[in-house]
Swiss-Prot record:
<comment type="subunit">
    <text>Homooctamer.</text>
</comment>
<keyword id="KW-0067">ATP-binding</keyword>
<keyword id="KW-0436">Ligase</keyword>
<dbReference type="GO" id="GO:0005737">
    <property type="term" value="C:cytoplasm"/>
</dbReference>
<feature type="domain" description="GS catalytic">
    <location>
        <begin position="105"/>
        <end position="355"/>
    </location>
</feature>
<dbReference type="InterPro" id="IPR027303">
    <property type="entry name" value="Gln_synth_gly_rich_site"/>
</dbReference>
<keyword id="KW-0535">Nitrogen fixation</keyword>
<dbReference type="InterPro" id="IPR027302">
    <property type="entry name" value="Gln_synth_N_conserv_site"/>
</dbReference>
<dbReference type="Pfam" id="PF00120">
    <property type="entry name" value="Gln-synt_C"/>
</dbReference>
<keyword id="KW-0963">Cytoplasm</keyword>
<comment type="similarity">
    <text>Belongs to the glutamine synthetase family.</text>
</comment>
<protein>
    <recommendedName>
        <fullName>Glutamine synthetase nodule isozyme</fullName>
        <ecNumber>6.3.1.2</ecNumber>
    </recommendedName>
</protein>
<dbReference type="InterPro" id="IPR014746">
    <property type="entry name" value="Gln_synth/guanido_kin_cat_dom"/>
</dbReference>
<dbReference type="GO" id="GO:0005524">
    <property type="term" value="F:ATP binding"/>
</dbReference>
<feature type="domain" description="GS beta-grasp">
    <location>
        <begin position="18"/>
        <end position="98"/>
    </location>
</feature>
<dbReference type="InterPro" id="IPR008146">
    <property type="entry name" value="Gln_synth_cat_dom"/>
</dbReference>
<dbReference type="InterPro" id="IPR008147">
    <property type="entry name" value="Gln_synt_N"/>
</dbReference>
């Protein structure tokens, strides 16, 4: 018998009990933490799950003398690692008094998404999550010679072949695991820089876009753990003439998707332009290294938009222009952005902010 036989042990004929993996965001605001508990039987709704707690002093989220942080279950996904009726549970974190802790960005986002004006607009998001795979012991991109560089960019985007595409096994495993989990993953592709990949989630409505991105990140990190490679969401992992990593956020409201929507899109983009500093400061750490005006980005200090322009802050697709309705893409969020913050801020600026 091998270890993997035991890991893959099917419990369904033996016990009703299930395992729930509680997932939360740690003290850096980007690190994911998790722990598992046994429950008496299958669960279909987060409201059926017990709250739990953890030692916040060990995650940089509470002092040692008052270390308890409370987990509130918010969203359930099927567990692709344990399979069966086992589940992954996305949680957010609160003080014992019931206050959201500072790294809990979901709480404020949920308030925006439950506002009647936002609910009426049925906000859709499609998020393009880029990431880079690194060799474990040297923290250098997968497929790159140790301490050296591959040939210049050009052959790698959406490429095939052992000399161009590095880490596809991780990418494929992640794609299927997300589909199994019930995440609305809509595609994958190899990126411009070798060792860099992208997956897309959406269209997802409101707060669920944030839940799905966070759980997709968790699943990816678990897969890289097994594969022995390191995952980074750094927006510019390699200095120089190499593309950075972003999380382009595609967005539409009900009004934008209906006839005459293009005019609403233009007004929404205008509103985004008026809140440039607020959005940039919320769009990810280290983004100034990526938003230089080169490598398919707009300069961080200016706001621009255009049809089919990948050098603009906001891009409108040709189809949207032609049909007079559709969606737009905010190209500024970095790969390490918090999707709760970005999605709710876009909704707040475009729907709740009166001109």
């Amino acid at each position: 018998m091998s270890l993997s036989d035991l890991i893959n042990l099917d419990l369904s004929g033996t016990t009703e009990k299930i395992i729930a993996e509680y997932i939360w965001i740690g003290g850096s605001g980007l690190d994911l933490r998790c722990k598992a508990r046994t429950l008496p039987g299958p669960v279909t709704d987060p409201s059926e799950l017990p709250k739990w707690n953890y030692d916040g002093s060990s995650t940089g989220q509470a002092p040692g003398q008052d270390s308890e942080v409370i987990l509130y279950p918010q969203a359930i996904f099927k567990d692709p690692f344990r399979r069966g009726n086992h589940i992954l549970v996305m949680c957010d974190a609160y003080s014992p008094a019931g206050e959201p802790i500072p790294t809990n960005k979901r709480h404020a986002a949920a308030k925006v998404f439950s506002h009647p004006d936002v609910v009426a607009e049925e906000t859709w998001y499609g998020i393009e999550q880029e990431y880079t795979l690194l060799q474990k012991d040297i923290n250098w991109p997968l497929g790159w010679p140790a301490g050296g560089y591959p040939g210049p960019q050009g052959p790698y985007y959406c490429s095939v072949g052992a000399d161009k595409a590095f880490g596809r096994d991780v990418v494929e495993a992640h794609y299927k695991a997300c589909l199994f989990a019930g995440i609305n993953i809509s595609g994958i592709n190899g990126e411009v820089m070798p060792g860099q990949w992208e997956f897309q989630v959406g269209p997802s409505v409101g707060i669920s876009a944030g839940d799905e991105i966070w759980v997709a990140r968790y699943i990816l990190e678990r897969i890289t753990e097994v594969a022995g490679v390191v995952l980074t969401f750094d927006p510019k992992p390699i200095k120089g003439d190499w593309n950075g990593a972003g999380a382009h956020t595609n967005y539409s409201t009900k009004s934008m998707r209906e006839d005459g929507g293009y005019e609403i899109i233009k007004k929404a983009i205008e509103k985004l332009g008026k809140r440039l500093p607020e959005h940039i400061s919320a769009y990810g750490e280290g983004n100034e290294r990526r938003l230089t005006g080169k490598h398919e980005t707009a300069d961080i200090n200016t706001f621009s938009w255009g049809v089919a322009n990948r050098g603009a802050s906001v891009r409108v697709g040709r189809d949207t222009e032609k049909e007079g309705k559709g969606y737009f893409e905010d190209r500024r969020p970095a790969s390490n952005m918090d999707p709760y913050v970005v999605t709710s801020m876009i909704a707040e600026t475009t729907i709740l902010l009166k001109p």
